[in-house]
């Protein structure tokens, strides 16, 4: 089954507004390809529109965890902002592999690394410097470390541990929301 574009776009726009984004910022995301990008190269929702669907799923999970655990974010928009923009760098991370693509509805992607670093740090940079959206320390660190300790070693692991000590509940909730979305809600789905 394919992702229902019209419903998905309306849901995403509503959540982006709940994140405190204005219409110009949402238009910029549209221009970047936020509503068309895949969520991954080949794992979960590796189809056009997968990124926005994954972001909706993460936001839904993060808002539910925020309510259930009575988490204290710096502002009511925070879980929406973090959930919807945690992977924004992926608008530039996956490029259609024209040599491997035979079906436009199920393209193959190649990875394009970011000059800003890993996708957590790169998403923070894009949100703050390119979209010019202000993030609180909690929001920035939740986006930066939404992958948890996966693949970390050395100084980066120490940095994660330091952030985790500062905002343990918010970082763990964001990581959990991302993992539940990718590995439960989207399990085995290239598309919906």
Tell me the role of every PLM-derived stretch:
Residues 25-31, 44-56:
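All-alpha helical catalytic cores of prenyl diphosphate-utilizing isoprenoid enzymes
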Residues 1-37:
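Non-catalytic interface/linker regions that flank or bridge core catalytic/transmembrane domains
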Residues 1, 191-192:
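Short intrinsically disordered terminal tails
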């Amino acid at each position: 089954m394919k992702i229902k574009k019209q419903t998905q776009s309306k849901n995403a726009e509503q959540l982006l507004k709940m994140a405190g984004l204005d219409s110009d910022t949402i238009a910029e995301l549209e221009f970047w390809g936020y509503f068309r990008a895949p969520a991954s190269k080949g794992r979960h929702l590796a189809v056009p529109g997968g990124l926005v669907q994954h972001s909706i799923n993460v936001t839904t999970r993060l808002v539910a965890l925020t309510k259930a655990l009575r988490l204290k974010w710096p502002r009511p928009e925070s879980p929406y902002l973090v959930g919807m923009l945690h992977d924004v760098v992926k608008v530039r991370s996956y490029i259609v592999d024209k040599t491997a693509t035979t079906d436009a509805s199920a393209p193959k992607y190649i990875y394009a690394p970011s000059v800003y670093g890993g996708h957590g740090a790169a998403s923070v940079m894009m949100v703050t410097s390119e979209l010019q959206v202000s993030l609180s320390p909690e929001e920035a660190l939740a986006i930066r470390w939404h992958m948890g300790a996966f693949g970390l070693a050395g100084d980066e692991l120490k940095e994660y541990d330091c952030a985790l000590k500062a905002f343990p509940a918010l970082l763990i909730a964001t990581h959990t929301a991302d993992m539940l979305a990718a590995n439960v809600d989207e399990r085995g789905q290239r598309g919906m």
